[in-house]
C-alpha cells in the first residue's frame, strides 16, 4: 500500500513545575450580619399612607415657547413621609413619572398597519392588556402628559407592517 512508512511521532511537551497559582484558591469574605428585625407584614407593605397628602411635589416645566422641550429632566425629587425603620424603602410609592402637561416622545412606536378599533384615524392609545405592565406611552397618557409617537421605519429587507412573510 504505502511504501513511505509511518508518520513521525510528535515530541511531548515538557512538564511544568508546580508554582504559585495566579488566583487565590479560596476567597475569604466577611460574614453578613444576621437580620435583627422581622420582615414587615403583608398588610403593612400595601398601606396607602406612606406619602402624606400635599407632600408630593411635581417640578414645573417651563419652556421659552410652547413645544420647545420634548424631554423630561432626569433628576426629579418627590418628597415622601418620614422614613421608618420597619418599612423597606423599595415599597415607598413614587410620584408621577411624567409631569402633567409635559410632552413625551416615543420613537418608532407607531406602526402604520396598527388599527385601534373600527374606523380609528386619530391616535388613541389603548390601555394595556390585563396582567401586562403599561408601556411608556400608556404611562404618560395615564398621568396627563402629551405623547408624540414617531413612525416605525420599514423597508423591503426589514419588513413592513402587513404581517406577511417572504420565503426565498
Curated annotation (Swiss-Prot):
Q: Which organism is it from?
A: Mus musculus (Mouse)
GO molecular function (one): identical protein binding
Tissue specificity note: Widely expressed. Highly expressed in brain.
Q: How is it modified after translation?
A: Ubiquitinated by SMURF2, leading to proteasomal degradation. Ubiquitinated by NEDD4, leading to proteasomal degradation. Following DNA damage, phosphorylated by HIPK2 which promotes DAZAP2 localization to the nucleus, reduces interaction of DAZAP2 with HIPK2 and SIAH1, and prevents DAZAP2-dependent ubiquitination of HIPK2 by E3 ubiquitin-protein ligase SIAH1 and subsequent HIPK2 proteasomal degradation.
| BP GO annotations | positive regulation of RNA polymerase II regulatory region sequence-specific DNA binding; protein destabilization; stress granule assembly
Where are the stretches annotated Disordered? Answer: 1-25
Q: What induces it?
A: By serum stimulation.
Q: Which GO terms describe its cellular component?
A: cytoplasm; cytoplasmic stress granule; nuclear body; nuclear speck; nucleus; transcription regulator complex
What does the UniProt entry say about where the protein is found? Answer: Cytoplasm; Nucleus; Nucleus speckle; Nucleus, Nuclear body
Q: What is this protein called?
A: DAZ-associated protein 2
Q: Where is the composition biased (Low complexity)?
A: 1-13
Q: Modified residue Phosphoserine is at which positions?
A: 77
Q: What does this protein do?
A: In unstressed cells, promotes SIAH1-mediated polyubiquitination and degradation of the serine/threonine-protein kinase HIPK2, probably by acting as a loading factor that potentiates complex formation between HIPK2 and ubiquitin ligase SIAH1. In response to DNA damage, localizes to the nucleus following phosphorylation by HIPK2 and modulates the expression of a subset of TP53/p53 target genes by binding to TP53 at target gene promoters. This limits the expression of a number of cell death-mediating TP53 target genes, reducing DNA damage-induced cell death.
Q: Which InterPro entries match?
A: DAZ_assoc-2 (IPR022730)
Going by the UniProt record, its keywords in alphabetical order are: Cytoplasm, Nucleus, Phosphoprotein, Ubl conjugation
Q: Assembly and partners?
A: Interacts with SOX6. Interacts with DAZ1 and DAZL. Interacts with IL17RB. May interact with FAM168B. Interacts with INCA1. Interacts with EIF4G1 and EIF4G2. Interacts (via PPAY motif) with NEDD4 (via WW domains). Interacts with transcription factor TCF4; the interaction results in localization of DAZAP2 to the nucleus. Interacts with transcription factors TCF7 and TCF7L1. Interacts with transcription factor LEF1.
Q: List the disulfide bonds.
A: none
Q: Where is this motif: PPAY?
A: 39-42
